[in-house]
Structures are given as structure tokens and as C-alpha cells.
């Protein structure tokens, strides 16, 4: 950097190359604002204003970095894809309305960079169009019944309510959030909880969205709500391989054969030190690799 010192007004301090892409496009296990120490070092060395970037999703984290003097500017990329109104929400005291990036890197890095396709976002389905859809309301009464209170069901229910539909969401469990909330119990996946938490907060502000928890979506109940539209958002279940006897053992009490969902449910029962223990993982996809890493 010393060769450019006299020509530079501001340093944008980042890191990572293709060989260390988990640092170039921050993996979700890296803490918020983790790169700020780099900006601080460059600032102290060259005495020039510095910008820091990297998983800065929380306004408090950004404020602390600036207050400590680690950096003079905060740079955000994925956070503004997830919520283009991030800065405005902070300025006007609406931090609780921020739709935080969960650092999944699927729609932005995977889809846009990896596949050279239009950008997408797991938590912001309107990333390419904005939220103009809210301006066009339904022109006649419309009842919408959404079955399932995971993130897909919450998104469908909120969207329907925001355009003026009377909306009913039915969830058989005591809590909303679905698989995203469950998976966030894995330590390196805890950031996923931000999305269902945001959706639950968004739903709570809609007076025409009625939520039934601990409720089964029976035909009688659905019919009684007089639906014009029914949305099936009941989620997915793990696919089991064709192994003889597997269905008799998997997820049963007293056995050590579990789907990933049951493994997460039992997460506090496993010893912290697994040295000497043998674990067989059937399936080498993303879920299998996550289990192996855990």
C-alpha cells in the first residue's frame, strides 16, 4: 500500500481471494464486523480514512466500529440487497424492521456471481422489483388461507395481507418460523433465526392477518374461513434412502438413528467431546456436510 499512499484519499479494507472465498464473501459463521481490525491497522499505519466491510448487519455493530475509531466508513453489500431500506430504517429509529442478511450467499454470490444470472435473495424475494406490489391493493374482498407458519407461509401471509386480503395463517406447532428456526439451533447456523424473527415481527403489525397456532388445518376449519385462495406452505421433510428397516428405527425413542431434524432436537444431549465416537452420515449433500462439520 505504501506505493499508493500519496495517491489514495480513502482505503477500502477487505480481504479474501478465490482460494479463500469464505473470507471474500463472508461465511455465516464469521461474526458481525469481524474485519474491522484490518481497517484499524491500515488507518493507524497510513493515517488515511478507512472503510470496513464484512457481515455488518446490526446498526449497533456499525456504531461501535465507528465509535472505537476502527474505521471512518461502513460499507455494506449483501445487507442492502436483503433490505435496501436499511439506512433509512436506522435513521428513523425503525431498527426492528430491518430484514437482515443471513449470509447464505445463495442468491447473490451463487446465482449472480456463480451462474451469471439476475441477482436473487433468500430473504428478499422482491429484490429485483422493490415493494411496489404493496401499492396495488385488491379491488374486492378476498380471503386467503395459508397453511404452514414457516418462512414461506409467513411471506405468503404477509404479502396477501399487505395488498388488502383478509388472511388466515394456520400453524400446527406452538411457534412460528418452521425449519429456519429449527436449523438455527446449530451453532454455526444461528444467524438463520434473524429471518423468521423478522417475518414474525412483520406479521404482528398487520391487523388483517389472523394467526392460529397449535391448530391443525382440517378441512372443516379451512372451509369455515371461506377461502378464495388457499396456500399450501407445509414445508418439507428429510428424504430417506431405501435402506431396509430404516423406517422402523429413524427418529424413534431409544435408537441412535436420526434425521437431521431429530438430531437438532437432541442437540443438547450430545457430548461436547465426541473423540472416539463413531458417527455415520448417510448423504453427502449440503445437509450432510453441515452435520459432519457440527
Question: Where does each model-flagged region fall?
Answer:
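Flavin-dependent oxidoreductase catalytic cores
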Residues: 1-147, 151, 155-167, 175, ...
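Redox-cofactor binding/interface segments in oxidoreductases and associated redox assembly factors
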Residues: 13, 76, 230-233, 281-282
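Short, contiguous acidic/charged loop-to-helix segments that flank catalytic cores in large enzymes
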Residues: 25-31, 134-142, 182-194, 266-271
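Hydrophobic alpha-helical scaffolding
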Residues: 28-32, 55, 147, 185-193, ...
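Rossmann-like dinucleotide/flavin-binding elements
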Residues: 138-169, 212-226, 237-242, 261-294
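N-terminal Rossmann-like dinucleotide/flavin-binding domain of flavoprotein oxidoreductases
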Residues: 179-227
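Short, conserved catalytic or adaptor-binding loops enriched in Gly and charged residues
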Residues: 200-205, 244-252
Amino acid at each position: 500500500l505504501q506505493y499508493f499512499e500519496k495517491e489514495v484519499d480513502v482505503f477500502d479494507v477487505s480481504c479474501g481471494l478465490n482460494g479463500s472465498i469464505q473470507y471474500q464473501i463472508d461465511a455465516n459463521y464469521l461474526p458481525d464486523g469481524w474485519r474491522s481490525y484490518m481497517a484499524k491497522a491500515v488507518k493507524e499505519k497510513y493515517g488515511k480514512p478507512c472503510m470496513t466491510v464484512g457481515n455488518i448487519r446490526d446498526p449497533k455493530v456499525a456504531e461501535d466500529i465507528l465509535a472505537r475509531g476502527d474505521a471512518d466508513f461502513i460499507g455494506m453489500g449483501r445487507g442492502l440487497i436483503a433490505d435496501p431500506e436499511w439506512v433509512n430504517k436506522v435513521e428513523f429509529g425503525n431498527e426492528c424492521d430491518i430484514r437482515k442478511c443471513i449470509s447464505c450467499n445463495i442468491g447473490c454470490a451463487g446465482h449472480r456471481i456463480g451462474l451469471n444470472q439476475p441477482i436473487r435473495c433468500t430473504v428478499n424475494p422482491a429484490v429485483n422489483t422493490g415493494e411496489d406490489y404493496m401499492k396495488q391493493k385488491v379491488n374486492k374482498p378476498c380471503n386467503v388461507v395459508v397453511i404452514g407458519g414457516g418462512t414461506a407461509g409467513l411471506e405468503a401471509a404477509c404479502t396477501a395481507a399487505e395488498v388488502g386480503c383478509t388472511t388466515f395463517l394456520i400453524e400446527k406447532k406452538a411457534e412460528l418460523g418452521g425449519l429456519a428456526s429449527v436449523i438455527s439451533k446449530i451453532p454455526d447456523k444461528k444467524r438463520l433465526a434473524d429471518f423468521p424473527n423478522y417475518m414474525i415481527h412483520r406479521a404482528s403489525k398487520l391487523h388483517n392477518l389472523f394467526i392460529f397456532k397449535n391448530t391443525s388445518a382440517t378441512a372443516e376449519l379451512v372451509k369455515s374461513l371461506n377461502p378464495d385462495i388457499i396456500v399450501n406452505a407445509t414445508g418439507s421433510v428429510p428424504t430417506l434412502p431405501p435402506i431396509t428397516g430404516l423406517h422402523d428405527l429413524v427418529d424413534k425413542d431409544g435408537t441412535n438413528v436420526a434425521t437431521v431434524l431429530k438430531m437438532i432436537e437432541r442437540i443438547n444431549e450430545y457430548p461436547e467431546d465426541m473423540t472416539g465416537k463413531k458417527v455415520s452420515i448417510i448423504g453427502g449433500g449440503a445437509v450432510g456436510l453441515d452435520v459432519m462439520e457440527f
